[in-house]
Amino acid sequence: MNTSIAFIGGGNMARSIIGGLLKQGVDKSRLHVSEPYEPTRPALADELSLQVVNDNVQVALAGQVWLFAVKPQVMKAVCAELKETAQANKPLIISIAAGITATQLDDWLGGGLPVVRVMPNTPALLGAGANGLYANERVDDGQKHIAEQLFRATGLCTWIADEALMNTVTALSGSGPAYVFLLCEAMQAAA
């Protein structure tokens, strides 16, 4: 992959995606990470052997693709900080935040952007996940390929034509594995 990726947020899911990309041989100079929580930055940098900073704009300027891995409740504020840069650079926007629509993201970043929503699930942390992907009308085939390449590093990928179905993907794929793990733990405890 020759695309530079800006990870806005360095939580568990971002770590799993980055880890999968590194295992696939992606050049770490193409990966840029911003993490606001200071105590997390050194551990994240050591774990991934990457530079991790506290500057979303700096990271965004380095990426052709911006992968938003922040909590939904802070997404609007993060987008406001990056709106001017988004309009100047027109990157491919990818979000793994549940409940935030492609239209909302596009609006918050100033409009006219290619946006992909992805709903990964917890097995992605082990490279065995299932990802539902939705692209708005501005995402071209090349950008779809980039998004799919990114998430194949964590597991299977399926494109969804209707964004309304992302809620179903979130409910089943996002939460389903947790229920299966809970059932397995209960069966193990009962044995």
Locate each region found by the language model:
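Rossmann-like NAD(P)(H) cofactor-binding subdomain of soluble oxidoreductases
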Residues: 48, 56-133
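Short-chain dehydrogenase/reductase
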Residues: 18, 79, 184
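Phosphate- and divalent-cation-binding pockets in alpha/beta enzyme and binding domains
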Residues: 16, 43, 77-78, 104, ...
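NAD(P)+-binding Rossmann beta1-loop-alpha1 motif at the extreme N-terminus of oxidoreductases
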Residues: 1-61, 128-129
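Internal alpha-helical scaffold of NAD(P)-dependent oxidoreductase catalytic cores
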Residues: 104, 108-114, 130-168, 179-191
